[in-house]
């Protein structure tokens, strides 16, 4: 198997790029990428894509992420973490009650200004390079979503609090920590940061590597995750021979909603089940029947007659991932086509 995912745990003290070099040295492959850079001082889940899985990295970058981080109150650093130098202090530390209560203020849609020490570009130059040269860095505010935020522990003696958060892509935990502290009339920076989950990838199943000598290629590949795994919650269509050929060669491909979409409600990575439809006067509501429990679940999708617009789904051919794309009035538009079948036709 040469196209797959690896659930790698990045240790603290090395860069994401250094970990890529380690994995490349073990596998002997050049087509490797990762989904979401972690700072040198951070640790945690860093999913790796190998081979054709690299075409799906964007989907994983867009996935929700969870973090556990510890904030030190009363000081601010220029980088937002312990790698930077202290630039301000304030003799004000929140109480335990305040550290817990502040969380509710940040749940939902939030506007963040990314930290100067970030990989974002300013006029073609990485922001962190400008920040290191002590040049002024102005970054535009970004809208992010905090789905969950709670305080796990408060240490009055050391003026620290540890938080858990589930957040959207583009969230900077260093900025979140600073904003939490400011909301508490204090200053703060991150002293520990751990990413515990990215989409389906969790830390309890992660592979921990610090050097190429710690694991063999065969042992690493034995822990691989199939390429379709991250498509678990995306609707899938099965293509016929002719439809697969059209998609493979970039031709226009139509799906008949009276026929093909009757079985649209399938999630390929889970145990297979048969989908059916409930027809109303204006739409089909796709239904999932769970044979193990006998329960029926209505999927959050209504297919309007003649429109059939779906932002994202994937197509498989003979059980193998063929393409991801969108549908517009029953016409499939490919975003990525995959070369996973040896003898295609």
UniProtKB/Swiss-Prot annotation:
<dbReference type="GO" id="GO:0031119">
    <property type="term" value="P:tRNA pseudouridine synthesis"/>
</dbReference>
<protein>
    <recommendedName>
        <fullName>tRNA pseudouridine synthase B</fullName>
        <ecNumber>5.4.99.25</ecNumber>
    </recommendedName>
</protein>
<dbReference type="Pfam" id="PF01509">
    <property type="entry name" value="TruB_N"/>
</dbReference>
<keyword id="KW-0819">tRNA processing</keyword>
<dbReference type="InterPro" id="IPR005728">
    <property type="entry name" value="RPE1"/>
</dbReference>
<dbReference type="InterPro" id="IPR020103">
    <property type="entry name" value="PsdUridine_synth_cat_dom_sf"/>
</dbReference>
<dbReference type="InterPro" id="IPR014780">
    <property type="entry name" value="tRNA_psdUridine_synth_TruB"/>
</dbReference>
<dbReference type="InterPro" id="IPR002501">
    <property type="entry name" value="PsdUridine_synth_N"/>
</dbReference>
<dbReference type="InterPro" id="IPR032819">
    <property type="entry name" value="TruB_C"/>
</dbReference>
<feature type="active site" description="Nucleophile">
    <location>
        <position position="39"/>
    </location>
</feature>
<comment type="function">
    <text>Responsible for synthesis of pseudouridine from uracil-55 in the psi GC loop of transfer RNAs.</text>
</comment>
<dbReference type="Pfam" id="PF16198">
    <property type="entry name" value="TruB_C_2"/>
</dbReference>
<keyword id="KW-0413">Isomerase</keyword>
<dbReference type="GO" id="GO:0003723">
    <property type="term" value="F:RNA binding"/>
</dbReference>
<dbReference type="GO" id="GO:1990481">
    <property type="term" value="P:mRNA pseudouridine synthesis"/>
</dbReference>
<dbReference type="GO" id="GO:0160148">
    <property type="term" value="F:tRNA pseudouridine(55) synthase activity"/>
</dbReference>
<comment type="similarity">
    <text>Belongs to the pseudouridine synthase TruB family. Type 1 subfamily.</text>
</comment>
């Amino acid at each position: 198997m040469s196209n797959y995912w690896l659930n790698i745990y990045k240790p603290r003290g090395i860069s994401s790029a250094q970990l890529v070099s380690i994995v490349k040295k073990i596998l002997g492959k050049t087509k490797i990428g990762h989904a979401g850079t972690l700072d040198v001082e951070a640790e945690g889940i860093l999913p790796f894509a190998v081979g054709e899985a690299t075409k799906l990295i964007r989907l994983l970058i867009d996935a929700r992420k969870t973090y556990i981080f510890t904030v030190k109150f009363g000081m601010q650093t220029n980088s937002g973490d312990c790698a930077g130098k202290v630039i301000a202090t304030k003799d004000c530390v929140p109480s335990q009650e305040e550290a817990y209560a502040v969380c509710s203020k940040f749940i939902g849609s939030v506007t963040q200004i990314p930290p100067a020490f970030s990989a974002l570009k300013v006029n073609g130059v990485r922001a962190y390079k400008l920040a290191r040269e002590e040049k002024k860095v102005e970054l535009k505010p970004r809208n992010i979503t905090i789905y969950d935020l709670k305080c796990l522990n408060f240490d009055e003696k050391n003026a620290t609090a540890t938080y858990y958060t589930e957040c959207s892509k583009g969230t900077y935990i260093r900025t979140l920590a600073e904003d939490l502290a400011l909301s508490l009339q204090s200053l703060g920076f991150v002293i520990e940061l751990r990413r515990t989950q990215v989409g389906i990838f969790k830390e309890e199943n992660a592979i921990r590597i610090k050097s190429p000598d710690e694991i063999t290629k065969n042992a690493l590949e034995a822990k691989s995750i199939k390429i379709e795994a991250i498509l678990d919650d995306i609707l899938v269509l099965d293509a016929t021979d002719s439809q697969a050929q059209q998609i493979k060669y970039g031709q226009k491909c139509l799906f008949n909603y009276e026929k093909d979409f009757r079985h649209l409600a399938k999630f390929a990575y889970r145990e297979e089940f048969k989908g059916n439809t409930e027809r109303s006067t204006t739409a089909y509501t796709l239904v999932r029947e769970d044979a193990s429990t006998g329960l029926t679940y209505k999927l959050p999708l209504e297919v309007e007659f003649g429109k059939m617009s779906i932002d994202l789904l994937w197509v498989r051919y003979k059980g193998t991932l063929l393409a991801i794309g969108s549908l517009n009035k029953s016409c499939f538009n490919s975003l990525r086509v995959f070369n996973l079948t040896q003898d295609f036709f």
